[in-house]
Regions:
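Tandem amphipathic alpha-helical repeat scaffolds
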Residues: 1-11, 31-48, 71-87, 111-126, ...
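Hydrophobic/aromatic side-chain positions at a characteristic register within alpha-helices
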Residues: 4, 24, 44, 64, ...
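TPR-repeat structural position
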Residues: 9, 29, 49, 69, ...
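N-terminal regulatory/sensing modules of transcriptional regulators
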Residues: 9-10, 57, 97, 124-126, ...
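Amphipathic alpha-helical segments of tetratricopeptide repeats
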Residues: 17-28, 57-68, 97-108, 137-148, ...
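Generic long, charged, amphipathic alpha-helical segments
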Residues: 176-235, 279-291
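Helix-turn-helix DNA-binding segment
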Residues: 277, 283-361
């Protein structure tokens, strides 16, 4: 399962989903939180954020009920990180605080690292660069203390972003040089893309930043992390706008805004729209049929039912009564303005939750 944390998850994904199906079929409550947390981590590092939240919530709930404090810490740290990217400040801080407390009690260094990363990403998304830099600097120290050197876990790219917003160009250059060297040494696309983004942010000419960002876009295309790809396009579009190349800037910024809207990454979507407005483009209305209005349990029920399970089977998988499942399904229909499971399946697919990727199907 290590690749799930190092952005090399393809093989692990195919192994975990059959395990989850077996655990559900056997009502193996003790095994479910661990498997659910791993699947949620994979979902959160791709573009399946809505179902990732539901999966984390289920893992957290089962871990609390069964007294599995290690898995509870895992789920809380993971959910904090996801909520950070969505700009859900209260939820993120609450999950991170509990995860940090449990990490200290249990000696879970990895989860402390993850919760700290969540707080840094929250501050960065909210525009609090100084707070973000403080958390990322602490994260660097934690990684060093635990002997963790893999560049995929490094906050280097985010720290460069924070330092530049603070006007600390020398510090940004120093961190970027270290991060780029580590990314090149590993040679994997996810970190290479972020390394090229750092170079694009720091380049002192239009040709220089364009070449760096274009290389970043190429590397992003080799990974499933659409959020990081959108961040690169946002940075690229911002530099193009400041270079007075409004036409090309709008192309990058529209692409970034579309991804942030689809993921419900509100602070980042707002920033992309602000950049677009600075080019003279009017903001488009948000699609009311997004999944953001569903509760995690409603979404979990939706994906199970559209994945082929009957109401009774979905109820058994989630330890609910069939009547409760039907009650939640009615609310799903009302919130989304639809009337059938076929419409629901189409909407889920349009929002990036294809049936083959859904846990438990």
């Amino acid at each position: 399962v290590g690749p799930l944390f190092l952005r090399e998850a393809g093989a692990g994904r195919s192994l975990l989903e059959p395990v989850l199906r077996t655990a559900r079929a056997r009502t193996a409550v003790g095994a479910l939180p661990f498997v659910l947390n791993l699947i949620a981590r994979d979902q959160a590092t791709t573009d399946r954020w809505a179902i990732a939240e539901a999966t984390y919530q289920e893992a957290i709930g089962l871990a609390r009920e069964s007294g599995q404090r290690t898995e509870l810490t895992f789920g809380l740290a993971g959910l904090a990180w996801l909520q950070a990217r969505r700009g859900r400040e209260q939820e993120c801080r609450g999950c991170a605080a509990e995860a940090l407390r449990l990490s200290a009690e249990l000696g879970m260094g990895l989860h402390e690292i993850w919760a700290t990363a969540a707080l840094g990403e929250l501050e960065l998304g909210l525009g609090a660069a100084a707070g973000a830099a403080g958390h990322f600097e602490r994260l660097q120290r934690l990684l060093a203390d635990h002997g963790i050197t893999d560049v995929d876990l490094s906050p280097g790219a985010d720290l460069v972003d924070a330092y530049l917003r603070l006007g600390r160009h020398d510090a940004a250059q120093r961190v970027a040089a270290q991060f780029v060297a580590a990314a090149v040494a590993k040679g994997q696309p996810w970190s290479l893309a972020r390394a090229f983004r750092c170079q694009g942010l720091l380049a002192d000419s239009e040709r220089g930043f364009a070449e760096a960002f274009e290389q970043a876009v190429v590397q992003h295309a080799l990974t499933p992390d659409s959020f990081e790809a959108a961040r690169t396009r946002l940075a690229y579009g911002g530099r193009l706008r400041r270079a007075r190349n409004r036409v090309l800037a709008r192309e990058q910024l529209r692409a970034a805004a579309e991804v942030f809207e689809r993921l419900d990454a509100r602070p980042w979507a707002d920033r992309a729209h602000a950049e677009l407005a600075a080019t003279g483009e009017t903001r488009r209305l948000r699609d009311p049929s997004s999944l953001g209005g569903l509760t995690p349990q409603e979404l979990q029920i939706a994906v199970l039912l559209t994945g082929g399970k009957t109401t009774r089977e979905a109820a058994a998988a989630l330890f609910l009564s069939p009547k409760t499942v039907e009650y939640h399904l009615r609310h799903v229909y009302q919130k989304l303005g639809i009337h059938s499971r076929d419409e629901l399946a189409l909407l889920l697919a349009a929002q990036g939750v294809p049936a083959g990727d859904r846990p438990g199907t």
